[in-house]
């Protein structure tokens, strides 16, 4: 048993997984010792959890990515969010970029990827626990996470991302993933800049707070792609436009 040579089992798929991690190697070492001492133990496998630190940036992941989930027979749905890692007014506050992946039919959490200068490990470890317990998204919707401005946001960044994914799965939000956009699924869509201030050169700017009906020169059957910095204003604009028949 060694972190250098470690061919384990992925606990989601049941398939062989290369996971040369010191953490799982130590767990396996403990289990081996217990087996040698006469206790029967069964190792459930790994999730491929990993984390690293770069200059000014922490990156972590656990579970299945979209491609791996699809190859394992799941129908994955994902969202990417940019969320505050603590109260925005607190010194040292920054952001997480989070990708959350779930199975479409069961809505079970399959994977999480997170990067940012803050406590990425906490985001990953929450996902590890959820995936290991077979949790679906709705069962985590109202978890009572620890909150104080130095540590988190009032709606935890994990819960925030989960809510966005639930909105997408339940049909309350329509969005493209970057991969879908690259594949051309937004071909023929009219791009509208809905940021706080105009940011996209050559694109029409729309302030959602000023929308009080059908947009001039944009019929309700037009395919429109709403773009902003973090997704929040695009979501609010989408809701406003749906109200007016789009």
Residue spans for each PLM region:
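Mid-to-C-terminal Rossmann-like scaffold of FAD/NAD(P)H-dependent oxidoreductases
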Residues: 4-118, 153, 157-184, 189
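Short phosphate-binding/catalytic loops that engage adenosine nucleotides
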Residues: 74, 135, 245-246
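Conserved beta-strand scaffold positions in the cores of enzyme catalytic domains, especially
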Residues: 76-78, 191, 203-208
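A short, polar/charged loop-to-alpha-helix boundary motif
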Residues: 117-136
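Generic hydrophobic alpha-helical segments
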Residues: 127-128, 181, 224
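Catalytic P-loop NTP-binding/switch module of NTPases
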Residues: 137-143
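Short, polar loop motifs at secondary-structure junctions
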Residues: 193-199
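Catalytic cysteine-centered active loop of the rhodanese-like fold, especially the PTP/DSP P-loop
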Residues: 211-246
């Amino acid at each position: 048993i060694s972190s250098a040579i470690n061919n384990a089992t992925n606990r989601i798929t049941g398939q062989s997984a290369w996971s040369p991690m010191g953490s799982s190697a130590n767990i396996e070492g403990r289990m081996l010792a217990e087996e040698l001492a006469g206790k029967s133990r069964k190792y459930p496998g790994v999730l491929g959890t990993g984390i690293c630190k770069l200059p000014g940036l922490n990156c972590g992941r656990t579970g299945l990515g979209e491609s791996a989930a699809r190859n394992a027979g799941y129908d994955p749905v994902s969202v990417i969010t940019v969320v505050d890692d603590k109260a925005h007014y607190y010194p040292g506050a920054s952001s997480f970029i989070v990708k959350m992946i779930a199975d479409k039919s069961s809505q079970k959490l399959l994977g999480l990827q997170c990067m940012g200068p803050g406590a990425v490990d906490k985001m990953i470890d929450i996902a590890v626990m959820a995936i290991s317990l077979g949790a679906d998204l709705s069962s985590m919707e109202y978890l009572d996470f620890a909150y104080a401005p130095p540590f988190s946001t009032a709606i935890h960044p994990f819960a925030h991302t989960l809510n966005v994914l639930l909105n997408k799965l339940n049909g309350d939000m329509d969005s493209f993933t970057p991969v879908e956009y690259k594949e051309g699924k937004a071909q023929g869509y009219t791009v509208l800049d809905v940021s706080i201030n105009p940011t996209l050169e050559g694109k029409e700017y729309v302030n959602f707070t000023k929308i009080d009906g059908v947009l001039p020169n944009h019929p309700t059957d037009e395919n429109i792609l709403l773009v902003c910095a973090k997704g929040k204003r695009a979501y609010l604009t989408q809701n406003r436009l749906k109200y007016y028949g789009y």
